Amino acid sequence: MKKKIIFASIFFLLITVSSQFIFHLDIKRQSYDTKIINISGKQRTYSQQITKIALYANEVKNLYRYYIDLDSLSTIVDDFSQDNYYLKNITSKNYKNETTDALFKENQVYFNKIVNAANRTIDNPDSQEIFEEFVTKIKANEAKFSATMDNLVNEYEAISKRKLAGFRKILTLYGVVTVVFLIFVIWFIIIPLYKKSKTLESH
């Protein structure tokens, strides 16, 4: 009986510690996935903001340099690039998936064209030719960038759902193990101890 109690205590401790560890990992994973999805969504916003600045300034043609907000454009491009760097590292290290790899690779083509054109405009604020090239690049690549980023967001969400489904299976397994453990404790420890106490009382 003593061995059974020791075994039950150790097993209970293992279940408790391991379940807490798994819960902690899943909460961290959910937070992580949410951050990835949010940053991906922000990338679409940045590309739209760059487009808005370019098209607004383009409306005034030769006077564009008096209307284009280079400070805002520079800030947006910096944020756009930093988040892209983060996504690039996360995608290559933590999302080993052919679909995300292919989508991100395609997305980078459009991203680089947008950023390179924007940076040339920022570095050459008095060049109408460079500005017009910037507008052309934006018109040719922004929609494609947003489309591939939409597909990436959808894929990240699908991966997150698959992970959640796997976590639910683990929870089910833990539930089954816990029930079996309780049956063991009741049948092999509590009931025998109860019978033993009754026997002692009768004497």
Where are these regions (language model features)?
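Extreme N-terminal signal-anchor transmembrane helix of membrane signaling/transducer proteins, especially
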Residues: 1-26, 176-180, 185-186
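Juxtamembrane loop-transmembrane helix junctions in multi-pass integral membrane proteins
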Residues: 3, 25, 29-32, 155, ...
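Amphipathic, well-ordered alpha-helical segments in soluble domains
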Residues: 17-21, 46-49, 53, 76-79, ...
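Short, charged/polar, low-complexity loop and linker segments
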Residues: 17-31, 119-129
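Juxtamembrane membrane-water interface segments immediately C-terminal to a transmembrane helix
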Residues: 26-51, 64-74
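Extracytoplasmic
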Residues: 42, 105-166
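Heptad-repeat alpha-helical coiled-coil/4-helix-bundle sensor or tether segments in soluble regions
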Residues: 70-131
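Selective recognition of signaling/oligomerization transmembrane alpha-helices
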Residues: 158-201
